[in-house]
């Protein structure tokens, strides 16, 4: 997932789940990428879809 355009102050409510390496489901790429930034890049995609 390319997170180069993040973090963003607000994400849409689009539902395209991403499962992170922390076993948490993020509602979409924007929310996932904002979490990646907060984790200093340690968070990765486990798979697309719910965890």
UniProtKB/Swiss-Prot annotation:
Matching SUPFAM superfamilies: Kazal-type serine protease inhibitors (SSF100895)
Keywords annotated in UniProt: Disulfide bond, Glycoprotein, Protease inhibitor, Repeat, Secreted, Serine protease inhibitor
CDD domains: KAZAL_FS (cd00104)
Domain (Kazal-like): residue spans on this chain: 1-49
One Pfam family hit: Kazal_1
Top-level division of the source organism's lineage: Eukaryota
Compartments, as annotated in UniProt: Secreted
SMART domains: KAZAL
Site (Reactive bond 3): 13-14
Protein name: Ovomucoid
Organism: Polyplectron napoleonis
């Amino acid at each position: 997932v390319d997170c180069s355009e993040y973090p963003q102050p607000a994400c849409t409510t689009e539902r395209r789940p991403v499962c992170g390496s922390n076993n948490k489901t993020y509602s979409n790429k924007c929310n996932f990428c904002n979490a990646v930034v907060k984790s200093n890049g340690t968070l990765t995609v486990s798979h697309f879809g719910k965890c």
